[in-house]
Design a protein with these regions (language model features):
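Core of compact, soluble alpha-helical bundle domains
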Residues: 1-136
């Protein structure tokens, strides 16, 4: 920590720092790191750019993100524990990098996103436990 007050407002610079710091930690994490590594290998920069666009769209309403998160996550071997770890790392990173309204908004949106993804992937506490569709 450099002694400067943590930012309370979200900016593109803060988003870039958050994404880069957070996903640096994700890459090193023994639980969720291997899932990302299997999907991305060493080619992280395009993914980080997409995530910067995603968080800019979510928090600043920039409209830069043009993806389909549910479809991207569907083939991954995700379980509730992966989302819990993702949220834990994200909250810790956010708390180190910003405060006040910025901190609240990032953490709130992360929880909503995690919940939405889990529902769409039919995992977690709100899973409907629907029968699997037969292969077409």
């Amino acid at each position: 920590m450099n002694g400067h007050p943590l930012p309370e407002r979200i900016s593109e610079e803060l988003i870039a720092e958050l994404v880069d710091t957070f996903y640096g930690r994700v890459r090193q994490d023994p639980l969720i790191g291997p899932i990302f590594l299997a999907k991305l290998g060493d080619d992280w920069e395009p993914h980080l750019a997409k995530l910067r666009d995603f968080w800019s769209s979510v928090t600043l309403m920039s409209g830069r993100y043009r993806g389909k998160p549910q479809q991207v996550h569907m083939p991954l071997p995700l379980e509730t524990r992966h989302f819990e770890r993702w949220l834990s790392l994200f909250e810790a990173t956010v708390s180190e990098l910003c405060s006040g309204p910025a901190r609240f908004l990032f953490i709130d949106r992360a929880h909503r996103i995690a919940e939405s993804l889990q529902i769409s992937l039919n995992i977690g506490p709100k899973a409907l436990d629907l029968p699997q569709r037969a292969a077409s």
